[in-house]
Amino acid sequence: MNNTMLEPSPATLDPHLLLPENYKLLLENDLVRVFDVRIRPGEKLRLHANGPSVIYVLNDGRLQHTYEDGTTKVKTAISGAVVWDEAEAHETTNVGDTDIHSIKIELKTT
């Protein structure tokens, strides 16, 4: 196992700093940052970047990611699902009619 430390999200794109009303920090240590993430219906989160993450989805919903190159991807969140999310910069919009609520575990090591 490679324990090389990765840099956390660049400060300028760190969702915890940019979006404190959406990303509540629950835990941080040398290995991970754990967030309670909430996005209201129709809400658009500005460009931000997460490290590689595991997401535990707490309720159903639909969201759209818009990437720096302009491409978009609509994703369906299913309550109880556990999802791997690669490190990348994106905007997120809740395109559904329910709150998006998840726990995001952002890895600091590989």
Question: Where do the protein language model's features map onto the residues?
Answer:
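Extreme N-terminal tail/first-helix region
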Residues: 2-24
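A short glycine-rich, His/Asp/Glu-containing loop-to-beta-strand
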Residues: 16-46, 51-55, 104-105
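Histidine-centered metal-chelating micro-motifs
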Residues: 42-45, 81-93
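Short acidic-glycine-tyrosine-enriched beta hairpin
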Residues: 69-87
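Glycine- and acidic-residue-biased ligand/ion/polar-headgroup-sensing regions
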Residues: 50-69
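Short, flexible surface segments
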Residues: 41, 59, 78-79
